[in-house]
Swiss-Prot record:
SUPFAM superfamilies: YbaB-like. This is Nucleoid-associated protein Pnec_0645. GO terms for molecular function: DNA binding. It comes from Polynucleobacter necessarius subsp. necessarius (strain STIR1). It is found in: Cytoplasm, Nucleoid.
Amino acid sequence: MMKGGLAGLMKQAQQMQEKMKTTQAELAALEVTGQAAGGLVKVTISGKYELKRVQIDPGAMDDREMLEDLIVTAYTEAFKQVEAASAQMMSGATAGMPMPPGFKLPF
């Protein structure tokens, strides 16, 4: 009985590993855009948090300090979107596998 339980657990772990690889590839291909000031500044990042694009409306260029703050705000919004998408996608990859509280994926 113990042997069958262990084999089942190993199979489940292998399936989770395959799902994790697929999910990580999906995350790498993901792009999200955060924006600030009603779209005057847009920042696009990948699921790996790599900066892809920054779009700035010409009207936002008059005040340098404000523009700097808007870029940070737009990036922070995009970052939060990736965090949420990552958590949702990873929870699907680990479905059925008990994880310790506070355990974060990917490793």
